[in-house]
Design a protein with these regions (language model features):
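Cytosolic ends of transmembrane helices, especially the final helix of ABC transmembrane type-1 domains
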Residues: 236, 280, 299-337
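An intracellular "coupling" helix at the cytosolic face of ABC transporter transmembrane type-1 domains
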Residues: 29, 138-151, 203-210, 220-223, ...
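Short intracellular "coupling" helices and adjacent cytoplasmic loop segments at the cytosolic face
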Residues: 2-11, 113-143, 208-242, 334-347, ...
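Membrane-integrated ABC transporters
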Residues: 1-48, 70-75, 130-166, 214-216, ...
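Transmembrane helix-loop-helix hairpins at lipid-water interfaces of multipass membrane proteins
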Residues: 36-93, 169-201, 275-282, 286-296, ...
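Conserved catalytic Walker-motif region of ABC-type ATPase nucleotide-binding domains
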Residues: 117, 244, 362-364
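Juxtamembrane helix-loop junctions of ABC transporter transmembrane domains
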Residues: 53, 57, 84-126, 130, ...
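ABC-type nucleotide-binding domain
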Residues: 345-460
Length: 460
């Protein structure tokens, strides 16, 4: 398994802002407007509720300090209570409404992924990188908590923190500016450290994919009935179990290294949190003892100073979390944009005509599978004339299936050309070309249907 190579440490193809623009585009094209309207409203309401909670107690204390009438005190308490109840109800309602837009965007991306897999060029199905990206794209959108949907949650939390940060900054504008700068500086350092450490998983994603793929293969062999006879006859049970356990130990070691790296991000953040909160508390206590700060203002500034640090930390922490999610979504986008070696919609149209005879010719065709040391087919010339019946006979591995795949356009030759009525098939729309053939290969899968429907591949 490769570790420490350039391959495992490649940078993401798309950054946070490019992924954000991409996700907004997916939502816009799918007309999922609620991710914009409801998401923004939810952020405003959530921040507003926190601000109202901050102002509640200082407002009551201020009324008591100034010796106002009981009616004024009850009015303040009643007004804030009604406001908080309304904001809480609105927050719960918007949270529920926001679920549908996020899920619809995720379903759209899952649909795009499924269409990519179903309609991709056949050589991509032999490409290890394509298969790895496909598996990662599935994991990134398989549940509501994965990156494709959690992306919107993170952006909502960032907007909430930005609104709260602006409001608290206004409240603290009368305090020492150096205190605010200290809070911001320590939070920025924490964010940068967390961002660098949280990229560890992305930099080693190829290594993780190798472990996951091997585990999936061993599980398939151990549970698939078609391998049961060989496992029992040759006594392979202990070997399969040992292979599973050894791979699981390697994967466990990988996870331990990953979580150890992530732990350092939390340690750094905790140390900086102690520094910035300690400085804020010390300054407020000095104002109270030396300048006689009123109790209501002390409580307001005390809560605002604590909250200000939390808003700043929240902004940067959520950006770090969003950055990590965007790494996963970058993988999804790389999969969806994986290059196609064949031409489809951009190829020349090829009309199927029942009154037109078709001749297939292989002209000096060679084919070598990726990673192979020699050609499976070498310098082959073959002509299949209209109406001609041919039988291809050969040993296992001689290239019979490969030859048929070349004729059917599932593979392009490494050298030479495949000609249809004298024309190279590569410029054509490959899907139009496929409509000319009906190939039955030795691979099969039995559907949960009648024998007739399995043979006909349709309902009769």
């Amino acid at each position: 398994m490769e570790t420490g190579t350039n391959k495992t440490k490649q940078k993401p193809k798309y950054d946070l802002w490019q992924i954000t623009a991409y996700m907004l585009g997916v939502a816009w094209r799918g007309r999922h407007w609620t991710v914009f309207t409801v998401g923004l409203s939810l952020a405003l309401v959530t921040a507003g509720r926190t601000i109202a909670e901050l102002l509640f107690a200082p407002a009551v204390l201020r009324v008591l300090e100034q010796g106002m009438a009981l009616g004024r005190l009850l009015a303040v308490i009643g007004g804030f209570s009604v406001l908080l109840v309304a904001l809480t109800f609105l927050q719960s309602y918007l949270s529920e409404r926001n679920l549908f837009g996020k899920m619809n965007v995720r379903v759209d991306i899952l649909d795009l992924s499924a269409r990519k897999r179903a309609g991709t060029s056949y050589p991509n199905l032999l490409d290890k990188r394509f298969l790895d990206l496909s598996a990662k794209a599935d994991r990134a959108g398989c549940t509501n908590n994965e990156s494709v949907e959690a992306f919107w949650v993170s952006w909502g939390e960032i907007l909430t923190n930005l609104f709260g940060f602006g409001a608290y900054l206004l409240l603290l504008s009368g305090l020492n500016a150096w205190l605010c700068l200290l809070v911001c500086a320590t939070s920025v350092v924490s964010y940068l450290a967390s961002r660098r450490i949280n990229e560890w998983g992305y930099r080693h994603r190829e290594e993780e994919a190798g472990y996951v793929k091997r585990l999936a293969y061993v599980q398939k062999v151990a549970t698939d009935r078609q391998y049961g006879k060989d496992i029992r006859i040759f006594g392979l049970r202990e070997w399969v179990e040992e292979l599973w356990e050894s791979t699981m130990r390697l994967y466990h070691g990988f996870l331990l290294r990953r979580e150890t790296a992530y732990l350092w991000a939390n340690v750094i953040d905790l140390a900086l949190l102690l520094v910035r909160n300690g400085a804020a508390y010390a300054y407020l206590i000095w104002l109270t003892l030396e300048q006689g700060l009123p109790v209501s203002q002390f409580l307001l500034y005390f809560g605002a100073a604590t909250g200000f640090a939390q808003w700043v930390s929240g902004i940067l922490e959520k950006f770090a979390k969003l950055h990590k999610q965007c790494l996963d979504i970058s993988t999804v986008r790389e999969f969806l944009e994986y290059p196609e070696p064949f031409r489809f919609e951009d190829g020349l149209p090829l009309e199927k005509r029942l009154d037109t005879p078709y001749e297939l010719r292989l002209e000096g065709v060679s084919y070598r599978y990726p990673g192979a040391e020699k050609d499976t087919i070498h310098k082959l010339d073959l002509t299949v004339r209209p109406g001609e019946n041919l039988a291809i006979v050969g040993l296992n591995g001689a290239g019979k299936t490969t030859l048929v795949k070349l004729l059917c356009g599932f593979l392009d030759p490494t050298e030479g050309r495949v000609l249809l009525n004298g024309q190279d098939i590569r410029p054509y729309n490959r899907r139009d070309y496929y409509k000319l053939f009906a190939a039955v290969f030795q691979d099969f899968s039995v559907l949960s249907a009648t024998v007739a429907e399995n043979v006909a591949q349709c309902r009769t």
